[in-house]
Amino acid sequence: MPSLSAKNQAFFNEPACERNRSKDFKVRKKGCSQPPMPGAAAGGCAFDGAKVALQPITNVAHLIHAPLACEGNSWDNRGTASSSHMLWRTSFTTDVTEFDVVMGHSERKLFKAIREINEAYAPAAVFVYATCVTALIGDDIDAVCRRAAEKFGLPVVPVNAPGFVGSKNLGNKLAGEALLDHVIGTVEPDDARSSDINILGEFNLSGEFWQVRPLLDKLGVRVRACIPGDSRYLDIATAHRARAAMMVCSTALINLARKMLERWDIPFFEGSFYGITDTSEALRQIAGLLVKQGAGPDLISRTEALIVEEEARAWRRLEVYRPRLQGKRVLLNTGGVKSWSVAHALMEIGLEIVGTSIKKSTDNDKERLKQMLTNDSRMSGATTPRELYSALSDHKADIMLSGGRTQFIALKAKMPWLDINQERQHSYAGYHGVVELARQIDLSIHNPIWAQVREAAPWEMAPARGEEMSEEEALL
């Protein structure tokens, strides 16, 4: 098995990434994302990326081989949802201390932790995550995992993604490699069908995928594995028998999609379930790929019939909100695939995009966005808080959609704000999701509180002309 260093170097040569193919060797070695700053890696390191990409696997115990802070900083930082098992919500850590490091007890402590988890919880598998401290002291988690798997008779998967090796995006890809090396293809299903698909890079934020799965069920399309959102270990172990795949977030798991194509001939495409048009196009592409892979040709006609029905229902429900939102200006401060997928959904509602962030977006994402926006100046990289505040306080936008980190900028500018990132509480995917998005924006913009907070405070208002305050009133 190749070393961690060799794997990391391989990620800088990704044939399925157009941006990567366009670079020369020197530029390619630099990678796409800036590495985390020393001392400020919490929430943006490779370990965090791997944890985010794998933790939604619900019936697996996720064991962090590290000091306590690594698990404390990474637990529950993404609002995924589960339809059954809740084991993934439990934190497990070996709590490596200075004494363990000095005395060399950390590997023994890891083995003991795996045994205790197996006895107390009987998980479908245990995922063991390497971190900076345990990787630097040379703990061989692969050997410990092999021994534990033999001893206890359950899958124990090493995830070698210590934080210092790179960015969060690299950690996503290392998580995909762990699935390829130790999980996918380890179980042969006895119920494989010609209409099985995989959904890659879908995290089921706030239960979003539950609004899409019923559409696929109506078409007779079965989701063999949704990686990682609301998935089970067995689903992923049998994912190699799917006939097609949809990539939702290519920056995270593009290596997984490409290697599943190479090993098991599973074709894939990149799509989005945000907005009416993109949801319909995703359903069409799923049907088209499955028919090419052997599904019945009537799947395409049934898909078109479903699209007509669902689109008509969605547009009818949007009629309530479109007159109230027509022409309203939105500042979209997100990144990645959402830079174009959410922007397209907002434009369908009738909103005007005055600016959108393209941080973490690929060249393909940027090209899609350029086709939607007539003015490239609306696209920006990492926007500073001062620039965001200026855009809002000057009334260049009526609402800002972003993550929780920038919500206080909007509140300081006394402007509406809506959470569009992973911490959100509402589902915006599929036909129902775009209606919910319109409803939440309408509620935010037309909330009467904004008119009240923009009024001057009583003590800021000058006395009316001709009125003089008495000495007693002044003292009061």
Swiss-Prot record:
Keywords: Nitrogen fixation, Plasmid. GO terms for biological process: nitrogen fixation; protein-containing complex assembly. GO terms for molecular function: nitrogenase activity. Gene3D superfamilies: Nitrogenase MoFe cofactor biosynthesis protein NifE, C-terminal, Nitrogenase molybdenum iron protein domain. Pathway: Cofactor biosynthesis; Fe-Mo cofactor biosynthesis. Belongs to the NifD/NifK/NifE/NifN family. This protein may play a role in the biosynthesis of the prosthetic group of nitrogenase (FeMo cofactor). This is Nitrogenase iron-molybdenum cofactor biosynthesis protein NifE. It comes from Rhizobium meliloti (strain 1021) (Ensifer meliloti). The lineage of its organism: Bacteria, Pseudomonadati, Pseudomonadota, Alphaproteobacteria, Hyphomicrobiales. The gene is nifE.
